[in-house]
């Protein structure tokens, strides 16, 4: 018998609940007043946010964590209680009764549904215990797939641009007063996190991940494919393998929107609605007269040959203009007025770790970006280069932490040439993300490859060493980008503080700004 995710009141337990994808699902379920618990080895603002909506978080991954919901019904209600207008929540059991009306209902099937991601090994103590106890075990994509079926759903897929595009669409629907539920792979200030709960049965905007093949589980009303490239070589051997995953996804979408600027999308998929930055490609949505300056990116938008109006984006780069076109296509399909769409695009401030400004100090701007694939790095550095004006910004400095041995080895040639828009490249050793180094590759190998194509390359293997090395390498007028999907961004505050200390020792008139800025 095929197991199905149960939203009628049975508890959920997430192994690794603090992950960006897992926490978004846990948040939505908790806000739907379902009992939620989970474990994570690190306490973060993400786990604190989950606790704030009633999730019980364990700091260790142990078999006993699964026994939380085997305690008394009163204990369960106390554990998962959420302040909803100052009242105790009710957990519907699907039969017209609620757990708060009749706590004994909680004793029915109290073994939790256990949710895990691809990162959780099968010898994990909680996973092994869940299997032994007979708990229903689901991959996080199973929960997302069930939610997609539960709403009027918009699923954003693609090798690059998923988080920004899904965040843009979610923000647009929010500005249009459509009260969407949103599940994305990054944090957005507009909803103070990576998820938002909206109207029951209303719109759901979700980021749909292809990295492990689970994209094929989703059946959205509207699907978007931003682009298709070979990535995640730990799962896919060839581009054809990736294409097959997206082709299955296409057949499961009621309507597909695709970007014709990606040759693979244009040749391998048949989207019903198309968009492109190039007017000559005949897409349904395109742009003309594109200009960029310190105030943003400006463009005229055309819909099937008819002029719609002008947009202005504050998030930089042609890749983000493409993401905006995807959002416009969705908005128009849903019947939104173009003025509402344009206002949302202008006021959208971006997602965290997507060209996110983390601070400024003595004429240096520090940027955090999740780019970890050669194409993403190239697009991000191109956006950075567009900001160089010779006055406030004069150089682009790229600090990159490679992510996964398999990706570094597979794309070594592409990594070697993707830093052309950086004036200075600083590389660290590879962030393993739990991989074993079967490729016998190191950050030093990457540094040597980049050095063959770039005159200014520095290799500092240790993250701990970067705050001591970098202050001597940067200067006023630099735009410093921290690139990668690993933990490089964690040293940014220390980096800014170290540079501030060093600069104030040599400059008596150093300017001190608020917050992390100096």
From Swiss-Prot:
Compartments in which it is found: Cytoplasm
SUPFAM superfamilies attached to this UniProt entry: MurCD N-terminal domain, MurD-like peptide ligases, catalytic domain, MurD-like peptide ligases, peptide-binding domain
Class in the EC hierarchy, top level: ligase
InterPro entries named among the record's database cross-references: Mur-like_cat_sf, Mur_ligase_C, Mur_ligase_C_dom_sf, Mur_ligase_cen, Mur_ligase_N, MurCDEF_pg_biosynth, UDP-N-AcMur_Ala_ligase_MurC
EC number(s) recorded for this UniProt protein: 6.3.2.8
Residues that hold ATP according to the record: 158-164
Protein name: UDP-N-acetylmuramate--L-alanine ligase
Organism of derivation: Crocosphaera subtropica (strain ATCC 51142 / BH68)
Gene name linked to the record: murC
């Amino acid at each position: 018998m095929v197991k199905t995710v149960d939203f009628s009141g049975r508890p959920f337990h997430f192994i690794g609940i603090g992950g960006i994808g897992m926490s978004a699902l846990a948040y939505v379920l908790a806000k739907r007043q379902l009992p939620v618990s989970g474990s994570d080895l690190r306490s973060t603002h993400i786990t604190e946010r989950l606790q704030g909506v009633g999730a019980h978080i364990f700091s260790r991954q142990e078999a006993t964590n699964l026994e939380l919901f085997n305690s008394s019904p009163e204990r369960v209600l106390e554990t998962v209680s959420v302040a909803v207008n100052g009242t105790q929540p009710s957990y519907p059991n699907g039969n017209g009764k609620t757990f708060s009306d009749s706590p004994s209902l909680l004793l029915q099937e109290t073994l939790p549904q256990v949710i895990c991601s691809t990162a959780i090994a099968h010898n994990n103590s909680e996973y092994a215990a869940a299997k032994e106890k007979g708990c229903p075990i689901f991959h996080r994509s199973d929960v997302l797939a069930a939610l997609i079926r539960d709403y009027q759903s918009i699923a954003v897929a693609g090798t690059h641009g998923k988080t920004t595009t899904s965040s843009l669409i979610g923000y647009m629907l929010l500005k249009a007063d459509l009260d969407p539920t949103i599940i994305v792979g990054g944090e957005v200030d507009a909803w103070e996190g990576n998820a938002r709960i909206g109207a029951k049965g209303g719109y759901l905007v979700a980021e749909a991940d292809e990295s492990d093949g689970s994209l094929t589980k989703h059946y959205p009303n509207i699907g978007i494919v931003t682009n298709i490239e070979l990535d995640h070589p730990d799962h896919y051997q060839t581009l054809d393998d990736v294409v097959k995953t997206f082709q299955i996804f296409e057949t499961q979408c009621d309507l597909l929107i695709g970007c014709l600027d990606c040759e693979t999308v244009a040749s391998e998929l048949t989207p019903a609605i198309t968009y492109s930055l190039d007017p000559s490609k005949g897409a349904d949505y395109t742009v003309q007269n594109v200009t960029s300056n310190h105030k943003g990116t400006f463009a005229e938008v055309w819909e099937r040959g008819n002029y719609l109006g002008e947009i202005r984006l504050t998030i930089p780069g042609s890749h983000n203009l493409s993401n905006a076109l995807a959002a416009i296509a969705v908005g128009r399909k849903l019947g939104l007025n173009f003025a509402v769409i344009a206002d949302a695009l202008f006021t959208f401030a971006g997602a965290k770790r997507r060209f996110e400004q983390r601070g400024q100090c003595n004429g240096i701007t520090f940027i955090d970006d999740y780019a970890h694939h050669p194409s993403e790095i190239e697009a991000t550095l191109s956006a950075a280069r567009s900001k160089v004006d010779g006055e406030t910004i004069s150089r682009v400095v790229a600090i990159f932490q490679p992510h996964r041995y398999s990706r570094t080895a597979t794309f070594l040639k592409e990594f070697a040439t993707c830093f052309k828009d950086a004036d200075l490249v600083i590389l660290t050793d590879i962030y393993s993300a739990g991989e074993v180094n079967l490729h016998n590759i190191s950050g030093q190998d990457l540094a040597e490859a980049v050095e063959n194509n770039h005159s200014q390359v520095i290799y500092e293997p240790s993250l701990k060493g970067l705050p001591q090395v970098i202050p001597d390498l940067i200067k006023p007028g630099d735009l410093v980008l921290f690139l990668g999907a690993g933990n490089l961004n964690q040293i940014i505050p220390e980096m800014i503080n170290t540079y501030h200390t060093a600069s104030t020792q040599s400059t008596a008139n150093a300017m001190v700004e608020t917050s992390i800025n100096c």
